[in-house]
Design a protein with these regions (language model features):
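Mid-to-C-terminal alpha-helical segments outside catalytic/metal-binding sites
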Residues: 2-7, 11-53, 81-88, 109-113, ...
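Short, well-ordered beta-to-alpha junction loops that form the rim of enzyme active sites
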Residues: 57-60, 99-101, 156-158, 205-208, ...
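Surface-exposed, active-site-proximal loop segments in enzymatic domains
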Residues: 59-73, 105-106, 167-171
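Short glycine-enriched loops at secondary-structure junctions
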Residues: 10-11, 102, 157-161, 285-287
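Catalytic pocket-lining loop regions of alpha/beta-barrel enzymes
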Residues: 87, 117-277
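Short aromatic-enriched loop/helix-cap "lid" or pocket-rim segments at secondary-structure transitions
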Residues: 15-20, 67, 110, 165-168, ...
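Divalent metal-dependent hydrolysis catalytic cores, especially in the metallo-beta-lactamase
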Residues: 27-67, 93-99, 121-125
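Aromatic- and glycine-enriched glycan-recognition loops and surfaces
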Residues: 32-40, 77, 81, 132-143
Length: 325
């Protein structure tokens, strides 16, 4: 049995939840999501399915949407302290990743604290920040810091303003989150971020969204607009000048395997991004059976990949270690 490191899981601590609701008066969460801080059950689930370690990230990114700057900063500091504390209490099981939900001087300082003081393996950002795309000028200092410090960024999808009815069946998360992930990755490429910071490491959740499936469409779309600039004048006013074909920048991204146990989706991601950029991740504990199903199904899906045993072992653990070591 190869070593298995789950590269994208979500967690809260009870202390964080209590402070969030009592100290900070935040009322944006319904009920008490105790399954997110049942750490003993989490460790038992790991044992039962042979998972050796987990990357732990802050759950429920939607709490930050539209949140006041000062409140968000206080909550972010608390969250990162709690993630670090949890990893210190369970060093054999948990690898901590911080979270930066907004970008400003204070949040950039918090990024530095995550890297320099808290010794996080990486930092989680969101696919849009208060509705602003990731290639917005105000976010470039974060990418500059991340590249300079060799700090991988875990990118979690975030909600956005769209149709009011999209939330009725939760399509805004079912399909909206992979779509927003796709938008974010495309903005990083076409906005010139990946051109400026070629060594920037991004871990995209849920298999890289639509990017692997539409890889050839991405390239053809870009080539069409480059070949006939007179027909797409608005495009050229916004798109960055790229020194390589657009597809080459997309292939630099990493993608996790949190696609609900779909081997074809994982094979598609491995074919597009290349197998060295695919990282085992389950989205635990968000599945039936409080996360056990997603562990079970995702391990099985990787086992059934169209790849040799060495490649599968890299997906299960080696690729992540290459990223964070």
């Amino acid at each position: 049995m190869p070593e298995i490191v789950d590269g994208y899981t979500h967690v809260l601590t009870e202390r964080f939840f209590e402070d969030l609701t009592d100290k900070f008066g935040f009322q944006g969460l319904s009920g008490r999501p105790e399954f997110l801080w049942d750490h003993e059950q989490r460790k038992q689930d790991m044992v039962d399915y042979g998972v050796d370690k987990q990357i732990i990230t802050l759950a429920l990114p939607t709490m930050f949407q539209g949140m006041d700057h000062d409140l968000a900063l206080d909550i972010t500091r608390l969250a990162n302290d709690e993630i670090r504390r949890l990893a210190d209490e369970h060093p054999d099981e948990f690898i901590p990743v911080g979270t930066i939900p907004k970008v400003s001087g204070e949040f950039l300082a918090e990024f530095d604290r995550c890297v320099d003081e808290l010794d996080m393996a990486g930092v989680q950002i969101f696919s849009n920040i208060d509705g602003r795309p990731l290639d917005d000028d105000q976010f470039w200092p974060l990418f500059e810091r991340a590249e300079a410090t060799d700090t991988p960024l875990w990118m979690h999808p975030q909600l956005w303003e769209w149709y009011d009815w999209a939330s009725e069946y939760m399509e805004h998360r079912l399909f909206g989150w992979p779509f927003d992930t796709t938008l974010a990755l495309s903005r990083l490429v076409f906005g010139g971020v990946m051109e400026e910071y070629p060594d920037l490491e991004i871990v995209s959740h849920h298999g890289g969204g639509m990017v692997p499936f539409y890889g050839r469409r991405i390239e053809m779309f870009y080539e069409q607009r480059m070949s006939y600039p007179e027909n797409y004048q608005g495009y050229h006013e916004h798109a960055a000048e790229l020194s390589q074909p657009a597809e080459e920048y997309f292939k630099k991204f990493n993608a996790d395997t949190a696609v609900s146990g779909s081997t074809p989706a994982i094979d598609c991601a491995a074919s597009f991004f290349n197998e060295g950029n695919v990282i085992f991740g389950t989205d635990y504990p968000f599945s039936p059976e409080r996360g056990r199903q997603t562990i079970d199904y995702t391990i099985d899906a990787v086992d059934r990949m169209n790849a040799d045993d060495e490649t599968k072992a890299d997906v299960f653990a080696g690729n992540l270690y290459d990223l964070i070591d």
